[in-house]
Regions:
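A structural boundary/capping signal
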Residues: 1-178
Length: 178
């Protein structure tokens, strides 16, 4: 919970002249490089790819089993999102800080529910997408290098899209199938 609270105060964007700046399309693709943990801490933020790396390293350092996942929509923008799920007592704990719309801590007994919840918040029309579990690549990768790493070296994960809802449990929300 403390990790999520701290990261929720961090910014979103690409470092440009010492500041985080939100860039889109070709500007993002040309300027972005995956950040090291120290760069992420220095700039107090990054994009979801950097948040996932930071969360993974933070949890791993504390001995908490976790996986990073990469979603790529097959839309005209090839929209992506990366996220971290920690495993505890047969539940997945999904920590979200970079996707402002759904910041928080979520718990679910089903990866299907977690991924479906994220997809529902990424797009109005969930159709074709890829989901991969990936091992953290080195920092300094370009946009294309990172995306290729996740697609070609990541482990394909197949889920069933389900309708979900959340139940507020105070410090966290539970994601359940409707």
């Amino acid at each position: 919970m403390d990790l999520n609270k701290r990261l929720n105060s961090y910014g979103y964007g690409v470092p440009v002249n010492g500041q985080l700046v939100e860039l889109d399309g070709p500007e993002f693709a040309n300027a972005y490089r995956t950040m090291s943990v120290s760069a992420f801490e220095k700039y107090k933020g990054g994009v979801c790819w950097d948040y996932a790396r930071y969360q993974h390293m933070y949890l791993q350092y504390r001995g908490i089993s976790n996986q990073n996942f990469y979603i790529e929509l097959h839309d005209k923008m090839s929209s992506t999102h990366t996220f971290t799920v920690a495993m505890m007592n047969d539940f997945g704990i999904y920590i979200e800080s970079s996707f402002r719309k759904i910041q928080g801590v979520y718990i679910s007994a089903s990866l299907d529910c977690i991924v479906s919840y994220i997809l529902k918040n990424m797009t109005d029309h969930v159709s074709d997408f890829e989901l991969r579990e990936y091992k953290d690549p080195r920092s300094g990768r370009t946009t294309l290098e990172f995306m290729n790493w996740c697609i070609h070296r990541g482990k394909p994960i197949h889920i069933k899209y389900v309708e979900t809802r959340t139940i507020d449990r105070g410090d966290y929300k539970e994601i359940v199938e409707v």
